[in-house]
Amino acid sequence: VGNADQDHAEWCAPEDQSDASRQVYQTSNGASDIAAEYAAALAVNYINFGNAEDLSYAKALYEFSIKYNKTAEDGIGEFYRSYDYYDDQAWAAGWLYLATKDNTYKTFLNTFMNASNQGKSGSSGCQWGVYSPMSWNNVSLGSAILQGEITGNASDWSKVTTYLNQKCNSESTYYCEDSWGSCRYNAAMQMAALATSK
């Protein structure tokens, strides 16, 4: 939703922008990445608040995501594209497993994560298992954290802790993944480290 060029040109609340019109996109056969992200969010909401409708929609969105296996990359503008959907589907599967204890979701999460560590490539040629800070484009680190929490296997946790130690093991420098939005990446890495250490 929105126009990134317009949004970046004005530094104010969206409702105060001079032209507050918003573009909205819809699909009936794609956007697996976005559908899975919403499925994950609704599953978390169900875990926190117990609203059965949230869980019902989370399951439906997850099924939609699995059915079409396409990213929303085409047609939504040039900003904040997600170049794959497997990481989002694994993220949703992890949260749906925690919400339902249905092993179907656990199996998908484990299948994705095991494939990612064997160098599976997605439709865009991205290398799975190469973690990065949580962002609109990649939530595989979060999926790996969920896998470690769900399985409790030391080998699953070691993948996460090895990555975090390689990136964040410095007391004298500011971690900077990318110069554009460096604080958000730093905060995302801190969140991942906190979630891993709990």
Model-predicted segments: where are they?
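Glycan-recognition and catalytic cores of secretory/periplasmic carbohydrate-active enzymes
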Residues: 1-198
